Amino acid sequence: MDFDLSDEQNLLRDVTREALTRTYDIETLLKVGDTELGWSRDVWSQLAEIGILGLGFDPDESGQIELMVVLTELGRRLAPEPVAQAALIPGGLVAELGNDEQRKLLDQVAEGQTLLALAHQEPGMRGLSVRVTTRAECQDDSWTLTGVKNPVLSGDCADSFIVSAALPAGGVGLFVVDADAVNRHPFRTFDGQRAAQLNLDSVAAQPLGVGGDATHGLQKALIRHQSALCAEAVGAMEEALRLTTDYLNSRKQFGVPLSKFQTLTQRAADMYVSLELARSMSFYAAMAIAEGSFDPVIAARAKLQICRSGRHIAQEAIQLHGGIGVTAEYPIGHYAARLTAIGQTLGSTDDQLHTLIGALGGYGTVSL
């Protein structure tokens, strides 16, 4: 695997970083976070102009490395725009499985005019499970869905949903549902993101593409989303570490900077080690997808390291900042909240370990 970014990918990173750095500081983030939407339509339009909202829609290009680059920069600035969950992940499903009519949605998504959301998670669901209790029923070639989806990230603002449901003949199907047809209850997550619960009561739905069992396509989308979360977490960890080291260099105690105390610098060094472990696993997971390998074991390894590194860096960043680290006006607590939320999205540490333990039986025994 070649872990070097191309010139185009470096340019995409630099343009995204410049746009977000120019837009977001802690005051702006707090102000935007208090709005009903929770993110900026103006920034969304800027991301569309850059070409970010259509990454990966081309069937000849995975776009996974570009997705990783963009999500890392979003994580670095704590940008609340739902690039992955309201555009790239559900849009990628439509690009892969949708029919010609449904693919017309992709131009609107890429231009920032339409928001999609993947409604797959259900109460009690853990990790990358594709088992759902929402039922799909067909009568006279018309499909209806019944069930509950929660949490649906960006479900509060989506114009259309890609909904997973159990098929009568077995397997899991994917359906396009208009937002006006569902009963949704928006809520705010503890890290300031937006989500919703969808109550589906015989809601009219259109099969995505030719219909039938879409389990494989759904699994690929979930693995892509997990990789995107890993990339976002790496960006957040990078900035949390930078803020912490800057604080240690500037804050004085007993007449000298805190960075002069060896114990504190060693703790910062341990944070750096955790960051590099997370970065390498995130890159590895993205590269595997870019090469066509949607391996849940690779995804679990990456997410496990992200969970561990994120928890370590978030906790140490707050501890090394002292009391200011938990104030709302200072950014480090918000980075800790986002890293904690990412650690629980699409599977916690325990869920990743469960996946890895379950895969052990496939390696066989070693004879000496």
Give, region by region, the residue ranges found by the protein language model.
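A short, Trp-centered hydrophobic/proline-enriched beta-strand micro-motif
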Residues: 112-123
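Alpha-helical interface subdomain recognition
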Residues: 1-78, 97, 112, 138, ...
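Flexible, small-/acidic-enriched active-site or ligand-binding loops
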Residues: 131-133, 151-152, 178-210
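N-terminal glycine-rich flavin-associated loop
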Residues: 79-100
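Short Gly/Pro-enriched turn/cap motifs at secondary-structure boundaries
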Residues: 84, 124-127, 152-153, 166, ...
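Short Ser/Thr-interspersed hydrophobic loop/turn segments at strand-loop and sheet-helix junctions
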Residues: 51, 71-74, 177-181, 203
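A short core secondary-structure module
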Residues: 119, 146-182
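A generic structural signal for well-ordered coil/turn residues at beta-strand boundaries
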Residues: 112-114, 130-132, 157-159, 171, ...
